[in-house]
Amino acid sequence: MLTMGTALSQQVDANWQTYIMIAVYFLILIVIGFYGYKQATGNLSEYMLGGRSIGPYITALSAGASDMSGWMIMGLPGSVYSTGLSAMWITIGLTLGAYINYFVVAPRLRVYTELAGDAITLPDFFKNRLNDKNNVLKIISGLIIVVFFTLYTHSGFVSGGKLFESAFGLDYHFGLILVAFIVIFYTFFGGYLAVSITDFFQGVIMLIAMVMVPIVAMMNLNGWGTFHDVAAMKPTNLNLFKGLSFIGIISLFSWGLGYFGQPHIIVRFMSIKSHKMLPKARRLGISWMAVGLLGAVAVGLTGIAFVPAYHIKLEDPETLFIVMSQVLFHPLVGGFLLAAILAAIMSTISSQLLVTSSSLTEDFYKLIRGEEKAKTHQKEFVMIGRLSVLVVAIVAIAIAWNPNDTILNLVGNAWAGFGASFSPLVLFALYWKGLTRAGAVSGMVSGALVVIVWIAWIKPLAHINEIFGLYEIIPGFIVSVIVTYVVSKLTKKPGAFVETDLNKVRDIVREK
């Protein structure tokens, strides 16, 4: 999910106890990174994918934490505070999309990526699945990942820097460097194992925060009567359909389509120890997501009553959680809640860094060095993976150095870009024997292009007809599906091995 992109302008008071809690949080992340480093054996698959040995509970919470980012704690409560319950449509779409993802994509992807040459990245899976000897598909999909995730990562660094600036009154660049250093440390040294464990730890912090803040806020207001007060202030605050047209509802609901093609999320399914563990992961993951999102909605709704009751001037709705955590709680607890925001931001940054590093190493460096070198020089490739983490982070920091850079405006569309270009391709690759390399390349590129064209030239026409304001993932997804299918039908069919592999994957997934 998208990280915060807007400025956090509401400064709150912080004392030494708050700083101590943040320091303890950072120390725990460093220890986990060191633990991941000590567990490493110099194997590339282990560094990038945890050796496919991750349990269901870490899988579930790491997928959730890397997905939600600062949006769940900052963006969603701010949106509900500003518009009321109608903002909840996006949470319904996301929860449904994530739930379907666990059923439709997760089991087959876990089995198929191992069967198809033990692929450790999505582009590598596409290459092996479609016998792409020229590596065209691998290079194009790898480039999409590297470019978009570098921008994604930059957005996370901006959010971290602005959090320290707004919550502590510290210099933006100091906060940026501090967040970057901690994330780079545990990702660089600990690899996938450290990232997954820290995501689990951060997921727990995020969940506690999203349950604690609205409950304490209600206790300090009017209990369950707080929602009655919110409705009395403005009846439409609790109206799920307020201010939304059919197009608006569909646009919010369609965010769920993006899940099937988000590399930093579906890589979690590839790393789980066995596909048979996915039901456990699904139950915990979806429960975590539902409770967390409902908590975020509750923060926004209680905030509508909280702000006037405490005579607070809220300059930026996205700072609502920060303000409530500092006003309602002891500084030590307030520090814990600020750590929850950092957890949300940093869990996404680390996941995106590692996916980008994996792509640079597996999808590009391996092409230069060759398959045989990759098998016999594993430590070299692990070192290249670590250096890739550092390089991508430095580029993202450089872009984030100017937080007002216009590139930030593009990051909000990356979810749609991945969803339109990768989601249909992943589904076709897992279920349809007729998919061809030409169809895959055409569908992926057309989906991405439609998203770009829709954002640049179609959406500005929304004032003429609201259909033009449709969320860009919908036209992008539809065009990608059509182009992939039509081009695959018109081009040379894949070999018989594809049907054999698909049947084998289906049979393994059905095993109890």
From Swiss-Prot:
Observed phenotype of the null mutant: Cells lacking this gene display an approximate 33% overall decline in L-proline uptake and exhibit significantly reduced virulence in several animal models, thus showing a negative impact on the ability of this pathogen to survive in vivo.
Keyword vocabulary terms for this entry: Amino-acid transport, Cell membrane, Ion transport, Membrane, Sodium, Sodium transport, Symport, Transmembrane, Transmembrane helix, Transport
GO molecular function: L-proline transmembrane transporter activity; proline:sodium symporter activity; sodium ion binding
Gene Ontology CC terms: plasma membrane
Superkingdom of source: Bacteria
Keyword Repressor in annotation: no
Membrane topology: Multi-pass membrane protein
Ion transport as UniProt keyword: yes
Induction of the gene: Up-regulated by high osmotic environment, such as increasing concentrations of NaCl, and low L-proline concentrations.
Main localization (coarse): membrane
Catalyzed reaction equations: L-proline(in) + Na(+)(in) = L-proline(out) + Na(+)(out)
Transmembrane segments: 16-36, 54-74, 85-105, 139-159, 174-194, 200-220, 240-260, 286-306, 327-347, 381-401, 410-430, 438-458, 467-487
Any one Gene Ontology BP term: proline transport
InterPro entries xref list: Na/Glc_symporter_sf, Na/Pro_symporter, Na/solute_symporter, Sodium:Solute_Symporter
PANTHER family registered for this protein in UniProt: SODIUM/PROLINE SYMPORTER-RELATED, SODIUM_PROLINE SYMPORTER
UniProt family annotation: Belongs to the sodium:solute symporter (SSF) (TC 2.A.21) family.
Function: Catalyzes the sodium-dependent uptake of extracellular L-proline. Since most S.aureus strains are L-proline auxotrophs, this transporter may aid the bacterial persistence during an infection of tissues with low proline concentrations.
Protein name: Sodium/proline symporter
Organism phylogeny: Bacteria, Bacillati, Bacillota, Bacilli, Bacillales
